[in-house]
């Protein structure tokens, strides 16, 4: 029995570790916005906020374009080979990050004029890398989400496994901001960062992912044939005919939009406040110094946000008697109240606490969306991940609004709107209307 449990645990650990990498690199991508606004976009004029949020836009564009391929590849070649392809895209994306720095340093005169803005050519290479990284993250999650949800690990239920994996993912997102400020940009004040500092860290990360890929190739990851159509099998129904799934895609679109808007743009709001003479302090300290390293107040905000997600997911992983619908309703109501108070008081520390309440939204929405889909699950996962494109849309909308209004403060109302849509899904949209919603024998609602 112990041997069988150990065999069962192996694939779970491998996929959880890769999910950690996905979370870590997703946040590294987003946290580069603040420093690269200084290093790349000093001459971008009044469009700085719009241009810098394109980093998140191109990352999540990868989800919209490439997620459906993940579901098809799972049906065609299985979970493991699709996962290996995602790691290949990840290596390519990290290589492009390195190339963007090298190109800018080597060819400083290669500048693109867009209206009154002047943007280094290397910045567009970085955006290409962001797209490839988003593609890698999308394909990885298309594999990991349905696999972990359906994988039978003794003593656990689906939403628990999802929350455990998401908690480890959140640990990666929590430590990433300090990786950006201390290891990539050397702990310098944000006004002093240089493009050349990107080269070595991203090259090291690429080598690390290569090693992870080679290790995964040698690991045994059993296929879960009951979660995907057999090769050549035609599915009788359109995946969009499942109402609770379709509305789940809409809900995840708004959820990821809210999550990424906070995680990526809260540091930009902090920089704006500092420039207006309203610099934030952490227990009375304007700068977080360890020796000569400046950890940065903006990085602390992001760390509290992503750390709150990790803590919330760890707590939720023990709640095996509370249904996903009740969990989602409760945390969404709390998130709406918190954001309303934060916007009214212009308090970024309260916005950073939103991560705790958003922590279980992903796993609850996914679990409710794929309930009873059976052989449609793999295809559903690919379509579901298209909804993550919300992470591209809402941060950019927020950046445009900040440029138009001259402040980030009231742009957080966008996040409150997103939370209201999620609340609708929790209360109404996630309910399976009748037995025709399920391709097989109807299961009790969760």
Task: Annotate each PLM feature.
Residues 176, 180-189, 203-229, 425-430:
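C-terminal membrane-cytosol helix-exit motif in multi-pass small-molecule transporters
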Residues 83, 126, 328-329:
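Primarily marks hydrophobic transmembrane alpha-helices of the MFS/SLC 12-helix fold
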Residues 29-33, 181, 239-303:
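Extracytoplasmic gate region of multi-pass secondary transporters
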Residues 139-153, 359-375:
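Intracellular juxtamembrane helix-capping segments at the cytosolic ends
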Residues 88-119, 333-345:
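C-terminal ends and interior cores of transmembrane alpha-helices
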Residues 157-185, 382-395:
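Glycine-rich segments within core transmembrane alpha-helices of 12-TM secondary carriers
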Residues 53-72, 303-315:
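Central cavity-lining transmembrane alpha-helices of secondary-active solute carriers
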Residues 10-41, 141-145, 262-270:
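Extracytoplasmic
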């Amino acid at each position: 029995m112990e041997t069988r449990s150990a065999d069962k645990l192996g694939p779970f650990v491998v996929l959880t570790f890769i999910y950690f990498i996905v979370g870590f690199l997703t946040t590294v991508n987003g946290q580069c916005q603040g420093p690269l606004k200084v290093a790349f976009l000093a001459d971008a004029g009044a469009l700085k906020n719009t241009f810098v949020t394109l980093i998140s836009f191109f990352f999540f564009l990868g989800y919209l374009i490439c997620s459906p391929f993940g579901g098809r590849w799972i049906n065609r070649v299985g979970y493991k080979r699709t996962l290996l392809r995602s790691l290949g895209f990840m290596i390519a994306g990290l290589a492009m990050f390195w190339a963007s720095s090298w190109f800018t340093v080597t060819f400083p005169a290669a500048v693109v004029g867009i209206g009154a803005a002047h943007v280094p050519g290397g910045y567009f290479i970085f955006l290409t890398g962001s797209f490839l990284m988003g593609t890698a993250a999308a394909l990885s999650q298309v594999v990991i989400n349905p696999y972990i949800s359906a994988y039978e690990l003794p003593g656990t239920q689906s939403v628990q496994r999802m929350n455990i994996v998401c908690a480890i993912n959140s640990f990666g997102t929590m430590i990433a901001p300090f990786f950006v400020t201390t290891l990539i940009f050397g702990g310098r004040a944000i006004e002093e960062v240089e493009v050349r500092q990107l080269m070595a860290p991203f090259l090291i990360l690429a080598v690390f992912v290569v090693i992870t890929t080679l290790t995964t190739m040698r690991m045994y990851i059993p296929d879960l044939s009951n979660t995907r159509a057999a090769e050549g099998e035609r599915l009788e129904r359109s995946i969009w005919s499942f109402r609770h799934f379709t509305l789940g895609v809409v809900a995840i679109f708004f959820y990821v939009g809210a999550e990424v808007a906070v995680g990526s743009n809260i540091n930009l709001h902090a920089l704006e406040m500092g420039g207006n003479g309203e610099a934030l302090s952490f227990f009375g300290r304007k700068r977080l110094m360890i020796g000569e390293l400046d950890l940065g107040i903006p990085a602390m905000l992001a760390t509290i946000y992503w750390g709150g997600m990790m803590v919330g997911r760890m707590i939720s992983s023990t709640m095996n008697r509370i249904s996903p619908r009740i969990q989602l309703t409760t945390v969404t109501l709390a998130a709406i109240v918190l954001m309303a108070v934060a916007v009214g008081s212009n308090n970024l520390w309260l916005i950073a606490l939103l991560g705790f309440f958003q922590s279980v939204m992903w796993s609850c929405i996914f679990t409710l969306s794929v309930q009873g889909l059976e052989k449609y699950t793999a295809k559903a996962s690919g379509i579901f991940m298209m909804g993550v494109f919300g992470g591209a849309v809402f941060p950019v909308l927020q950046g445009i609004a900040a440029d138009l209004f001259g402040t980030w403060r009231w742009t957080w109302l966008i996040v409150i709107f997103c939370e209201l849509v999620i609340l609708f899904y929790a209360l109404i949209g996630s309910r399976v209307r009748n037995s025709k919603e399920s391709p097989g024998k109807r299961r009790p609602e969760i």
